[in-house]
Amino acid sequence: MYLMKDITRDGNPVLRKRAAKVSFPLSDEDQKLAKDMMKYLEVSQDPELCKKYKLRAGVGLAAPQVGVSKQMAAVLVPAPDEDEKPLFKDVIINPVIVSESVQYGALTEGEGCLSVDKDVPGYVPRHDRITLRYQDVNGETHKVRLKHYPAIVCQHEIDHLHGVLFYDHINKDQPFEAPADTVMIS
């Protein structure tokens, strides 16, 4: 399992590179990468284990964030009620956004990132709804429609695969100005 010391920090060139496509079947190394990224998210979302291992809680972790420039990210968006199944949980490989809404969505508190240690205030406008195509660890192709928070999380992780960080989207002059009709998500 990854620890915070394993997370690549802002300033490392791998975070600004376009990641390479992943080929199938997955190598043993890529299978371990996928498993370890998801394990980090699972452990980080358990308050006791998060504290024990001194982790920062996360809902997504992209391969470049652990120093591997490959198009792979683990996403684990929990349900509001912990007894329900997650809103989205999978390792997305070679993801492509095939369609997106005209309407934007943004988190009211802004976004954060395991690779960015400082707080960067401001709204990060993203498409409120997306259709995502990706392969899972078995190479099977999935096409899913996501909206609101799960859509935002997946766009954030896909940005990592293209060398983009969340704060690149923040309006530098008016950080808390969002496009008209933006859905604000708390």
UniProtKB/Swiss-Prot annotation:
- Which branch of life, at top level? Bacteria
Biological process, per Gene Ontology:
co-translational protein modification; translation
Molecular function GO labels = metal ion binding; peptide deformylase activity
Keyword entries, A-Z? Hydrolase, Iron, Metal-binding, Protein biosynthesis
* KW Hydrolase (keyword) present: yes
The active-site annotation reads E157
Task: Give the enzyme's EC designation.
Answer: 3.5.1.88
Q: Coiled-coil intervals in this record?
A: none
Family, per entry: Belongs to the polypeptide deformylase family.
How is its cofactor bound, per UniProt?
Binds 1 Fe(2+) ion.
Q: Which reaction does it catalyse?
A: N-terminal N-formyl-L-methionyl-[peptide] + H2O = N-terminal L-methionyl-[peptide] + formate
| Role summary | Removes the formyl group from the N-terminal Met of newly synthesized proteins. Requires at least a dipeptide for an efficient rate of reaction. N-terminal L-methionine is a prerequisite for activity but the enzyme has broad specificity at other positions.
Residues that coordinate or bind Fe cation = C113, H156, H160
This protein's cofactor list reads:
Fe(2+)
The identity of this protein, by name, is Peptide deformylase
The protein's organism comes out as: Limosilactobacillus reuteri (strain DSM 20016) (Lactobacillus reuteri)
